[in-house]
Amino acid sequence: MNSIISHRGTYDSENTSLESIKNCVEKDIGIEIDLRLNKDTVYVSHDPCEPSLFFEDICSYLTNTNVQIALHIKELDAIAPSLKTLKKKNVSNFFLFTIENHKIQQKEDFQIAYYANIMPHDVSDQIIWCDESIKKWFNTETISELKNKNNQLIAISQEISTNCLLDVAQSYWKFL
């Protein structure tokens, strides 16, 4: 099964906003959200900055939805308060991932995706976040091998990481 996850939760906009998150949920489009911590508050941003969009506000739109929610933990200290907010807001259809796979400690009942920028081996996580922004590593064999292990693969689409025409992106989608 293929599905779409919106990069940084944007939909018909350039930046993540409450409106873009709401639009994704209404259109049944999954959401990838970058989370950071400022003091005790989790905020949404790809890069460190002064917080203007807070995770707790976004969670109001994520309650009772079936869209897949990918939480990209940019700072490991954001994990515990993020989980607390998710529990408080009753958000359940999510998974966490970080480029520092080994540093997420599974203490509660939540899913972790394995971040891979090369072909992963001996991965026990069910979800694999496949990133080719640094190096191309997908091919028919690697995709088949990972799928045969019952992994859910999430790939970053070409147009996110490079300038490309729509037909190039669509060709990539078919390949996946």
Language-model features: locations:
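Phosphate-group recognition and catalysis centered on beta-loop-alpha active-site segments
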Residues: M1-L176
